[in-house]
């Protein structure tokens, strides 16, 4: 074998980074594989935009078939994103006996089971290190160095846009809308930021991490997802008063034959390592029965870090090919017959501490009515703050509860919000402060 040819479908930001890395560090890569890795063909609908890279004549095409049907191409890199035509391209590559490397967390979070099964039948790899955490080597660690562990929890700050916004709100006391506008101007947020700020991107990623850690199949549609657009500077300030920071946290937990998988704003202690993950950085924390707690930290997006992760997967495939191996490891790290069936715990059944903020008239008996409704639903109060006394006007009342069941808390808030003393819908934020 004189070289290993790869084909790229999708020549956007990450695709450009992959091409640059192969061309820039080709000699280094060859010294670690044994033969050169050659980028033979790039398919994209736009082949006229100047991407700041010089490519050989004839490498670019608008026809993905030139990648998928080329018998010399052993590895297809899918970087177009989304569900279709990405899914069709990936399945066709597999059917043609080609290994697949992708950064498409949305595709795998929804259609992973079908894709993994197809790869198993054809004895080819599907690798996706770049789908979670950009350049942070978290997936290879789960499948490799930590494979002997039973995992109990996985927690992650997995979206740089949300983390940047919450960091600025925390440090400057700024409002959500103002920071979002700045993030868009700096290129940290898309013109339509819904995918990021409503937690969808993070939910795709935690679906993959939970599947990998717990050896089960979790799809995006099963993840409880709540974004950060409702977080106000008022909540940020009260969190600080209680010794917490607010982060968009992805949470996965296993309890016997049940699993939790959820994404939502979460208060975590300000002295906790995850609370110090600021700006556009990501972090993922695992707890294994033998390795204990382990945290990975780094840039979770961007051309260079993500391209680095893609090339890491390509090198892994290339080394297997040099050793005469087709598929060395199933995508989730478990033998196909060893995947567990775990039941997803509904959000109403989780137990947590809660931050509750009420906007109520400042008059005698208000706190008694609120605490009475909470007690009726088996919710006990740990601490309270009331600020801005103004008789006859509405003021914020903030309570921190002891651990309670979510459906009980929701029922209590539904009742309290009917009180004539309440002027705005009550606010709930979950607290994670007892992490293994």
Task: Kindly give the residue locations of the regions a language model identified.
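N-terminal glycine-/serine-/threonine-rich beta1-alpha1-beta2 phosphate-ribose binding loop
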Residues: 1-96
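A conserved regulatory-domain signal marking ACT and ACT-like small-molecule sensing domains
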Residues: 309, 314, 318-436
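Substrate-binding/catalytic subdomain of NAD(P)-dependent oxidoreductase enzymes
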Residues: 179-276, 280-283, 302
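Glycine-rich phosphate/pyrophosphate-binding beta-alpha loops
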Residues: 228, 292-294, 298-304
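Rossmann-fold NAD(P)-binding glycine/threonine-rich loop
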Residues: 86-96, 105-143
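Low-complexity, glycine/alanine/valine/leucine- and proline-rich hydrophobic stretches
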Residues: 264-289, 303-304, 375-391
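Rossmann-like NAD(P)H-binding beta-loop-alpha module
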Residues: 120-201, 208
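A short hydrophobic/small-residue beta-strand
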Residues: 99-101, 381
């Amino acid at each position: 074998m004189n070289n290993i040819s790869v084909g790229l479908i999708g020549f956007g930001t990450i695709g450009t980074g992959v091409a640059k890395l192969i061309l820039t560090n080709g000699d280094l890569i060859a010294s670690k594989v044994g033969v050169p890795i050659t980028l033979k063909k790039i398919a994209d609908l736009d082949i006229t935009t100047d991407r700041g890279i010089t490519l050989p004549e004839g490498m670019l095409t608008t026809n993905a078939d030139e990648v998928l049907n080329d018998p010399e191409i052993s590895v297809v890199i899918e970087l177009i994103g989304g569900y279709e035509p990405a899914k069709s391209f990936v399945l066709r590559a597999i059917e043609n006996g080609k290994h697949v490397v992708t950064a498409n967390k949305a595709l795998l979070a929804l259609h992973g089971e079908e894709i993994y099964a197809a790869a198993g039948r054809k004895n080819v790899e599907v690798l996706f290190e770049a789908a979670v955490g950009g350049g942070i080597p978290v997936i290879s660690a789960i499948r490799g160095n930590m494979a002997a562990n039973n995992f109990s929890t996985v927690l992650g700050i997995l979206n740089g846009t949300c983390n940047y916004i919450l960091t600025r709100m925390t440090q400057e006391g700024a409002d959500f809308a103002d920071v979002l506008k700045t993030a868009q101007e700096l290129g940290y947020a898309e013109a339509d930021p819904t995918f990021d700020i409503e937690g969808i991107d993070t939910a795709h990623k935690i679906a993959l991490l939970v599947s990998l850690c717990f050896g089960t199949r979790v799809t995006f549609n099963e993840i409880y997802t709540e974004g950060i657009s409702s977080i106000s500077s008022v909540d940020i300030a009260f969190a600080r008063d209680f010794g917490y920071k607010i982060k968009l946290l992805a949470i996965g937990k296993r309890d016997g034959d049940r699993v939790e998988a959820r994404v939502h704003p979460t208060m975590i202690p300000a002295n906790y390592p995850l609370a110090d993950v600021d700006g556009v950085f990501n972090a993922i924390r695992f707890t294994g029965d033998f390795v204990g707690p382990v945290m990975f930290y780094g840039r979770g997006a961007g051309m260079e870090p993500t391209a680095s992760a893609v090339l890491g997967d390509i090198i892994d495939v290339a080394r297997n090919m040099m050793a005469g191996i087709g598929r060395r490891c199933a995508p989730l790290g478990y033998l196909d017959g060893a995947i567990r069936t775990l039941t997803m715990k509904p959000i109403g059944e989780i137990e947590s501490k809660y931050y509750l903020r009420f906007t109520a008239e400042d008059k005698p008996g208000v706190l008694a009515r609120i605490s009475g409704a909470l007690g009726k639903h088996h919710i006990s109060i740990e601490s309270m703050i009331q600020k801005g006394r103004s008789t006859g006007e509405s003021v914020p009342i903030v309570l921190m509860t002891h651990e309670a069941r979510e459906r009980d808390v929701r029922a209590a808030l539904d009742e309290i919000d009917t009180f004539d003393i309440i002027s705005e819908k009550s606010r709930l934020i979950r607290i994670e402060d007892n992490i293994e």
